Amino acid sequence: MTRRSDQEKFDRFTELAARVLGVPIVSLALVGPRHGVVTSSAGLPAPFVLLLAHRFSRRVAASRRPLVIHDARRHPLGANTPAVQDGLVIAYAGVPLFDAGGGTLGTLCVMDTRPRVWTREQLERLYDVAWVLGHAVDWRAPRRPASEPRQWRRPTAGHGTPHPSQG
């Protein structure tokens, strides 16, 4: 769950990442061992982004390492993914999102609809945005009760939560 002020921060960070990196799609996903939920996205509604990047984001969060894919059509993680086969995601760069204590929260990822060679500078910018985001939100603060509108519930296995602007 996120507080409304946190949601505004998340949305600003995803929009900032899109502008700074010049990409059409950005996703901020909170990822658990068996599930993930896109907390904020730019370029596409969150439910679509979750379907597009879930496999990649889980790998980044689990490994606590970045994942950089220049052309997912030729990458073992992406070649058989419907989003890649349909041309919705071709290039992907994702970094883990850590809280101030070093705990893994999820991922911040950027995607493109065409092959893209990610530069060192772009990856450093992505890391910078993720670092600032991880330190800008008080992850231990109480979240809004589930009964409040536009809330975010902790995801259950196999179920994402729609983006507030979608419902």
Where are these regions (language model features)?
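Intrinsically disordered, low-complexity terminal regulatory regions
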Residues: M1-A53, L123, Y127-V129, A136-P145, ...
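Short hydrophobic/aromatic beta-strand element in the GNAT-like acyltransferase core
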Residues: I25, G94, T107
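Regulatory sensory and allosteric helical modules in signal-transduction proteins
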Residues: I25, V31, H35-S41, A46-I90
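Glycine-biased flexible loop/turn sites that connect beta-strands or occur in inter-domain linkers
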Residues: L28, G102-G103
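A short, aliphatic-rich beta-strand micro-motif
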Residues: I90-D99
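PAS (Per-ARNT-Sim) sensory domains
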Residues: G106-T107, L123
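Short beta-strand-to-loop transition segments that serve as allosteric relay/switch motifs
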Residues: T107-R116
